[in-house]
Amino acid sequence: MSTYEELISLLRDCKRVLRAARKPTWDEYIESAKIAGLGILIVGGVGFLIRVIVQLIELYT
């Protein structure tokens, strides 16, 4: 398959996906924001705990 044919195939696939997609509702946006925010808080909390543990280890060694 040539590069041109691969590009045409990719564009067809993208077009098909975009046709099937729909704009999310406001409630779906809010739900996604809550989930993303929770994920950010969890990752930040884990990072904070690791930093505190490392500082405590350095303090007592």
Curated annotation (Swiss-Prot):
Cell location: Cell membrane
InterPro entries assigned to the protein according to its UniProt record, in alphabetical order: Prot_translocase_SecE_dom_sf, Translocase_Sec61-g, Translocase_SecE/Sec61-g
Keywords: Cell membrane, Membrane, Protein transport, Translocation, Transmembrane, Transmembrane helix, Transport
SUPFAM superfamilies assigned: Preprotein translocase SecE subunit (SSF103456)
Regions crossing the membrane: 37-57
GO molecular function, one term: protein transmembrane transporter activity
One GO term of the biological process aspect: protein targeting
Membrane topology: Single-pass membrane protein
Pfam families: SecE (PF00584)
Signal peptide: none
Family, per entry: Belongs to the SecE/SEC61-gamma family.
Summary of the function given for this chain in its UniProt record: Essential subunit of the Sec protein translocation channel SecYEG. Clamps together the 2 halves of SecY. May contact the channel plug during translocation.
Assembly mode: Component of the Sec protein translocase complex. Heterotrimer consisting of SecY (alpha), SecG (beta) and SecE (gamma) subunits. The heterotrimers can form oligomers, although 1 heterotrimer is thought to be able to translocate proteins. Interacts with the ribosome. May interact with SecDF, and other proteins may be involved.
Protein name, per record: Protein translocase subunit SecE
Species name: Methanopyrus kandleri (strain AV19 / DSM 6324 / JCM 9639 / NBRC 100938)
